[in-house]
Amino acid sequence: MKQYNDLFKIIHREGYIFIASFALVSFLLASFNEKLGCIGCIATAWCIYFFRNPDRFVPISDDLVISPADGIIQEIKEALPPPELGLGDVEMIRVSIFLNIFNVHVNRIPANGKILALHYNPGKFFNASLDKASIYNERQSVLMETAQGQKIVFVQIAGLIARRIVCDLEEGNEVKTGERYGIIRFGSRVDVYLPLKTALLVSKGQTAIGGETIIADFGRKKTTEFKFDRK
């Protein structure tokens, strides 16, 4: 029984219906045409791969902010946080992580702390790699206070293909770094907003691993002056 439980743990529950549907269609196609059945099996295998839910080795420290998602650090810039969270016109450092369809899409809590507010904002479905996706696309914004008293924001953003954001958090939740909290289906983006004086440990173009890559360290002084693009 444990082996079956382990199997289900490595696949996110949001994928069960898709995998079952793909498998059923593959079976039906195979009964009519062997080649179509093979194509269906490949599609089913890809679906299983997409919804994989691997364990990660999470750095443990109240000072650290880790990547909430797998992907490429697409942009680091000064930007206003989502207005729906009520943080005003104070700019923060925005670290944008782009996920392609081959990345793990399970999202993780970036720091120890408490969830202060959540807000779902319906919107467009522009390509998640575009800067305007942070403003106009469908998104789920989360404001939290870290164990060190810092307020940070992380945002799940739907993309051109992604059409469903899943967030399992509730206001008042006490959370731990690296805990799974949601998923975005089929290509997306996650933005992390940090205070301006935060010492960043990542750079544009770097590959991030959700739950493992350290984005920032509140215990360090900011020693590097980053140049930001204003667009």
Swiss-Prot record:
Cofactor(s) recorded in Swiss-Prot or TrEMBL: pyruvate
Principal cellular location given in the protein's record: membrane
Keyword Lipid metabolism: yes
Record text on cofactor binding: Binds 1 pyruvoyl group covalently per subunit.
GO terms, biological process: phosphatidylethanolamine biosynthetic process
Record keyword Hydrolase present: no
One GO cellular component term: plasma membrane
Reported modifications of this chain: Is synthesized initially as an inactive proenzyme. Formation of the active enzyme involves a self-maturation process in which the active site pyruvoyl group is generated from an internal serine residue via an autocatalytic post-translational modification. Two non-identical subunits are generated from the proenzyme in this reaction, and the pyruvate is formed at the N-terminus of the alpha chain, which is derived from the carboxyl end of the proenzyme.
Recorded GO MF terms: phosphatidylserine decarboxylase activity
Known partners and oligomeric status: Heterodimer of a large membrane-associated beta subunit and a small pyruvoyl-containing alpha subunit.
Protein name from the UniProt record: Phosphatidylserine decarboxylase proenzyme
Classification lineage: Bacteria, Pseudomonadati, Pseudomonadota, Alphaproteobacteria, Rickettsiales
